[in-house]
Amino acid sequence: MANDPTHQFLVQPIIPIEIGGVDFSFTNASLFMVATVAAASGFLYFATSNRGLIPTRMQSVAEMSYEFIASMLREGAGKKGMVFFPFVFSLFMFVLTANLLGMFPYFFTVTSQIIVTFALACLVIGTVIVYGFYKHGLHFFGIFAPSGVPKALLPLVASIEMISFLSRPISLSVRLFANMLAGHITLKVFAGFVASMGALGALGVGGAVLPLIMTVAMTALEFLVAFLQAYVFAVLTCMYLNDAVHGGH
């Protein structure tokens, strides 16, 4: 199983719990979701607990993260969208921290589980729908009828827009899940190839040099992808929240 590149994504129970025939086991995925929240919360707490005019490195990173998301939200959803800052910031930090933790050996990448990313995506779309109807009532349906569309084409356009809207949780979740899954599998394959070549002795060492270089390069790339995927998730969230804030206007 050690050579199986997909073994790292296997959800395994740590504390088996079954109630009424339903499995509520505390798994490795559960553990690392808790660890992700703890790591992100701990970082922000220690980074801001001793704030000063001359910021420490941790404080600078925390402040840059704050400004980064605030600027993204203002551009994506306008000033009125700033009401969602805690929501978007929390999502960004969770996804980013989960992605980064998954880069360490023997750590579990929770964002490589489609059920986790789909739950996050449904949370985003659910927030858009609830706030949209709360803010605009039935006028929220205006997002499915873009202005300037001829009346003859309105039913077709509205149908397409509605299908596009309902597919957002799928596209948002699959994008994050697929990128993290593919990246980690590729790293595992290259690392396994290096180990296999090295086991051949002196003859294999020479052949392992190129795969080793590729593994190091791809590891650096995966750290970049970890940030980019969190960024894309946050950007798309801001764009979707724009519909809730401004409705069909």
UniProtKB/Swiss-Prot annotation:
GO terms for cellular component: plasma membrane; proton-transporting ATP synthase complex. Keywords: ATP synthesis, Cell inner membrane, Cell membrane, CF(0), Hydrogen ion transport, Ion transport, Membrane, Transmembrane, Transmembrane helix, Transport. Disulfide bonds: none annotated. Signal peptide: none annotated. Pfam families: ATP-synt_A. One of its GO terms (molecular function) is proton-transporting ATP synthase activity, rotational mechanism. It is found in: Cell inner membrane. The chain crosses the membrane at residues 29-49, 84-104, 114-134, 140-160, 193-213, 216-236. It is a multi-pass membrane protein. F-type ATPases have 2 components, CF(1) - the catalytic core - and CF(0) - the membrane proton channel. CF(1) has five subunits: alpha(3), beta(3), gamma(1), delta(1), epsilon(1). CF(0) has three main subunits: a(1), b(2) and c(9-12). The alpha and beta chains form an alternating ring which encloses part of the gamma chain. CF(1) is attached to CF(0) by a central stalk formed by the gamma and epsilon chains, while a peripheral stalk is formed by the delta and b chains. Belongs to the ATPase A chain family. Key component of the proton channel; it plays a direct role in the translocation of protons across the membrane. NCBIfam families: ATP_synt_6_or_A, PRK05815.2-4. This is ATP synthase subunit a. The lineage of its organism: Bacteria, Pseudomonadati, Pseudomonadota, Alphaproteobacteria, Hyphomicrobiales.
